Structure formats: C-alpha cells, structure tokens
Design a protein with these regions (language model features):
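Acidic, surface-exposed loops and disordered segments
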Residues: 1-346
Length: 346
C-alpha cells in the first residue's frame, strides 16, 4: 500500500460551525492515525450527537501474540489520546468515561467491546487551565505531531535524551494514572536486550506465531508493497528467523539511551487504555522534540520473560504493560496505511 492509503486531515478544514456529529467525525480523522500493534488498527467508533462511543474491535486481536488483549487495548488507548489532543486543538472540550469491566456488555457491534465514551462540549475543555502560553504551545505541538509521528525501527544514537523531556514523560504518565520506568543504566539495558533475544527465539519457534505474523505482513498492513509483503509473509512462515531477529532486536535495545516501560497497578481494560494514552502522549512529545520512539512488545508477550522483566525493574505488584525505545535516530520514512474513518464507524 502507498501513501494514498493514509489520508491525513487538513486542520484548516475543521467544521467549526457544523453539528456535533460532523465535528466528532472530523476529530476521528486524527484518532485513526494512532499507532497499533502490527498496525492492526483495532478500533471502532459510534457517533451520536455529541457522544463518541469507543470500541475495541476484537476481530483484529492477535490471538497468539496477544491472547489477553493487552496490546489490543493499549492500541485503542493511543487512538483515544489522539482524539483528545485533536479536540483540545480545536477548542472542543470533552470528558471521558471509561466503561468498567463489570458494566461492559459482552459484545457491541460486530463483536466489538464498548470501552469508553467521549462526550464533546464546547463549554468544558480537556485542559481547563489555558492561562499558560507554554501549556497552550505544548498542546499545539502535540497536535502537530500526530501526523508527523512515526515508529522508528532504526538503531538509535548514543546521545542522551534531555532530562526535561524525561521529566515531562513521567509527569504525563502520572497524570494518566500509570507508572513509567525509565531505564538509562547500560547494564540494565543489556539485561533487557538479553530478554529480547530470548523472546524472539521463543516466539519464532512457535509455528502459530509465525503464521499469525505472516498474515499481517502478507496483507500489507505493515506498509510494504505487495511483492515485498508476500515475500515477507513466506519468509516469516517457513524460515527459522528467531536467532536473526533476536540478534537484531537486542542490538536495537542496547542502542537506545532510554528503554521505557509503562506500568499499571491492575490488569483492567481501563488501565490498559490509560497506558495507551500515556504511550501516545509520550510518542507525540518525543516527535515534537525531534526524538524517535519504537515500541517493542515481544518480551511482554512471553509470560515468564515478562515476569523476569518485572523482577528486573523491581515493580512489585505493578504490571509491565508497554515497552518502548526512546532516543535520537535518523528519520524512518516508513508510513503504514490507515483505514479511513468511514471504515471504522459503526
């Protein structure tokens, strides 16, 4: 698929004088630009008047790599954060109501699960204190970063990440109600890299994992052209790539000056959504600062290695939910395709 399959909205076209549903659908053009596991884009939205219902599309869950849906809900949380950042940019205040696990119906449209509701209101802003010009400037920078954000698979340079950026990420994570571990010590990063090697080797030793990964590669979801996607699909399915991937990815881990792990105190859907929101805000912040971000989920997809990571970080009762590299790198021009808003409305 080419860039034509990733339509990007024109901010100047925001329908300020239109009805609430039209404004909501415009904001969703930014929500769908969010990152997601394997570019699965597992979100659906229902719009009625000033209400946007957010659904997790479980038909797009990676049932082998992500059997408990952790990455599914983190991905939906990323889309939710984009929606809220866009609403703030256009002066559309909103409130978010998470649907608790106890109250959530078994299914929504097409077996999708209703996970949150966003209510739009011009009279109430997401960020109520807009007196600070710096705060307003940051919100604008985050919005601009939505279209610019890329997942960067390149090796990172060794130069450090500014302390001011790290402090901002920690503050944002706390505001989202989640934890953030920032691993800058080379020795601990080496230990995480060793876990990465083992995770890749274990996963690629599983034929069902290779088949699932091959399906997503083969349909072009990861941005490759048709021929490259088909070749990649066959390679993943039939070649033992675990050792090669483990070696490559462990080097990526050690190349990063920061390995970040977002954590939660419980294992609820709401916590996973909050982690997704925190990650996307971190990714937008990094983009606005000229930094690169690369999520790496393999360690967290292997239960005993996830437990080892938790012990390494001293998390106690908290759960590691999302891991990513942060640092400086040459730009990665890869642009993965996106489903248009029309395809994710229910």
């Amino acid at each position: 698929m080419d860039d034509a399959s990733r339509p990007e909205p024109d901010a100047a076209a925001f329908p300020a004088d239109a009805d609430a549903e039209t404004r909501a659908e415009f904001l969703l053009r930014y929500a769908v630009l969010a990152p997601s596991s394997h570019n699965s884009q597992p979100w659906l939205f229902g719009v009625e008047d000033d209400e946007i219902r957010v659904y997790a599309d479980e038909s797009r869950q990676l049932t082998v790599a992500d059997p408990d849906g952790r990455e599914l809900y983190v991905s939906v949380g990323c889309a939710l954060e984009n929606l809220l950042v866009a609403a703030e940019r256009f002066g559309v205040g909103c409130t978010v109501e998470y649907v608790s696990d106890d109250d959530r119906p078994e299914s929504g449209p097409d077996a999708a699960r209703h996970v949150a509701t966003v209510r739009l209101d011009r009279e109430s802003a997401v960020v109520t204190d807009r007196e600070s010009a710096a705060a307003t400037g940051r919100e604008s920078a985050l919005f601009d970063a939505i279209a610019d954000r890329r997942t960067n698979h390149r090796p990172f340079r060794s130069e450090s990440v500014p302390e001011s950026v790290l402090e901002r990420l920690e503050t944002d994570a706390a505001s989202a109600g989640v934890g953030l571990e920032l691993v800058t010590d080379p020795a601990r990063r080496e230990r995480i890299a060793a876990l990465q090697t083992r995770a890749d080797e274990r996963q690629f030793d599983d034929p069902s994992y290779r088949a699932e990964l091959g399906r997503w590669i083969g349909d072009g979801s990861l941005g490759a052209g048709w021929l490259a996607a088909r070749v990649g699909q066959l390679a993943v399915r039939y070649l033992d790539m675990g050792a090669r991937e483990g070696k490559k990815n462990s080097k990526l881990v050690t190349s990063a000056p920061v390995v970040a792990v977002l954590t939660a105190d419980d294992d609820t859907v709401e916590s996973r959504l909050r982690v997704g929101r925190a990650f996307e805000r971190a990714a937008l912040t990094a983009t606005s600062e000229g930094l690169a971000v690369h999520p790496m989920s393999q360690i967290l997809e292997v239960e005993d290695l996830r437990a080892e990571l938790s012990e390494l970080l001293g998390l106690g009762e908290s759960e590691p939910v999302h891991l990513f590299r942060l640092g400086h790198a040459d730009p990665d021009a890869t642009r993965t395709p996106r489903r248009p808003v029309e395809d994710v409305l229910v």
